[in-house]
From Swiss-Prot:
Gene that encodes it: SUB2
The protein, known as: Subtilisin-like protease 2
Record's GO cellular component terms: extracellular region
Enzyme class: hydrolase
Stored Gene3D superfamilies: Peptidase S8 propeptide/proteinase inhibitor I9, Peptidase S8/S53 domain
Taxonomic source organism: Arthroderma benhamiae (Trichophyton mentagrophytes)
Keyword hit for Chaperone: no
Active site per the UniProt annotation: D169 (charge relay system), H201 (charge relay system), S357 (charge relay system)
Similarity remark: Belongs to the peptidase S8 family.
Length: 419
């Protein structure tokens, strides 16, 4: 069975360091949650078949617990825990003994059984400069001064108004002044933890999407969907949160006015790639980070989900930072080094960070921005428009990636500029 290390994508660096290096992803047996699994069911099952399958699982699990073989494992298991339904994809998490896992893997209704994983957050260090990223988004890829605060960012004054950006992350400080009351507490999957952001990552990402100073879509709403806390998470919580987001977007009838940002990455994990793909088929746009391994993104999840918008990081002078993943699955490049945004520790707190965690929300913000000013009825239309606006052949050392830099299209439209 596949092992996975899965984490948020901000990189550690010290003040003055302009070439931060990524921490290695350390996958190993200790990452596995003992006795806990994610089970994916085959497509096309009826509600009655799924209900009967769950009854069968409970019966088999109970019988195996009564046997000596199950008790000998030393792991307490609790059976089915949570069910996830994304479009026509059905999965569930559960605590099972080894014999039950063997029985599940042979069940005709089961597509796959994967061990659940701990998910680790990258360490970050504060560095106090840089505001180049926004200016880059409206400059057609023209190199901009790194530390200048005078770079112009031109945009239509609708600026994401009436659009919802869902941030699956560590939570958001919705009281931060940058959000001007547009922050919403959506879902908290972490048990016995408040719906706050004690780590900073989610607030930082949300600020790049929709902060009044640091955001691409300055009037968009940001919805906190907390699947991480301080240090680690598992797919049990990540899938629960992603499932909630898809349901909330669908039930609120806002598929063409919503975007999901996933500034997370780990080794290839098919069940979650499948979930992102099913959301796309349901009419929902997801923007994801390419990853910080300095390798081909095809081996990362959710970057390898074929219809997510996968974002690599570019520096202010159009070079690829050594940490950014690359490859044919990287759809677009956006600012991802020394980017300033909101932070933990207070309603005015800020921090400057690097990583594809910063690049992804630039594009999620661009999606929200475009949704507010154009009729983009489907994820395919969103992706096509975002890619149509890109500036080609600017990124040095893009490897074999599509060489396309994010751009908001302002110079091609007679938009009213902000006051």
């Amino acid at each position: 069975m596949q092992l996975l290390n899965f984490g948020l994508l901000l990189l550690p660096f010290v003040a003055g360091d302009l070439a931060p290096q990524p921490e290695p992803l350390l996958a190993g047996p200790s990452d596995v949650v003992p006795g806990q699994y994610i089970v994916t069911l085959k497509e096309g099952l009826t509600s009655a078949q799924i209900r009967d399958h769950k009854k069968w699982v409970s019966s088999v699990h109970r019988a195996n617990l009564d046997s000596f073989a199950a008790g000998a494992s030393g792991v307490e298991t609790e059976g089915i825990m949570k069910h996830f339904h994304i479009h026509d994809l059905n999965m569930y998490s559960g605590g099972f003994d080894e014999k039950t896992v063997e029985d599940l893997s042979r069940n005709p209704y089961v597509k796959s059984v994967h061990p659940d994983q701990h998910v680790y957050l990258a360490k970050t260090v504060t560095q106090r400069q840089a505001r180049w990223g926004l200016g880059y988004m409206s400059s057609k890829g023209k190199p901009v001064p790194l530390h200048s605060t005078l770079v112009d960012y031109s945009y239509d004054d609708k600026a994401g108004e009436g659009v919802w950006a869902y941030v699956l992350d560590t939570g958001i400080n919705v009281n931060h002044v940058e959000f001007e009351g547009r922050g919403i507490l959506g879902h908290n999957a972490i048990p016995n933890k408040p719906h706050t952001d004690e780590f900073g990552h989610g607030t930082y990402v949300a600020g790049i999407i929709a902060g009044k100073t640091y955001g691409v879509a300055k009037k968009a709403n940001v919805v906190s969907a907390k699947a991480f806390d301080t240090g680690s998470s598992t797919y049990n919580y990540i899938l629960e949160t992603y499932d909630w987001i898809v349901r909330n977007i669908t039930d609120s009838n806002r598929k063409n006015k919503a975007v999901i940002n996933l500034s997370i990455s780990g080794a290839k994990y098919q069940p979650f790639d499948d979930a992102v793909e099913k959301a796309f088929k349901a009419g929902i746009t997801t923007v994801v980070a390419a990853g910080n391994d300095g390798k081909d993104a095809k081996n990362n999840t959710p970057a390898s989900s074929p219809n997510a918008i996968t974002v690599g990081a570019v520096r202010w002078e159009n070079t690829r930072p050594s940490f950014s993943n690359y490859g044919k699955l990287v759809d677009i490049w956006a600012p991802g080094e020394l980017i300033k945004s909101c932070w933990k520790g207070g309603n005015n707190a800020t921090s400057t960070q690097s990583g594809t965690s910063a690049a992804s929300p630039h594009v999620a913000g661009l999606v929200a921005y475009l949704m507010s000013i154009e009729n983009l009825p489907s994820p395919s239309a969103v992706t096509a428009r975002v890619l149509n606006l890109t500036i080609p052949n600017l990124v040095k050392d893009a490897k074999d990636s599509p060489n396309r830099v994010a751009y908001n299209g302002i110079q091609e439209r007679k938009f009213k500029l902000p006051k």
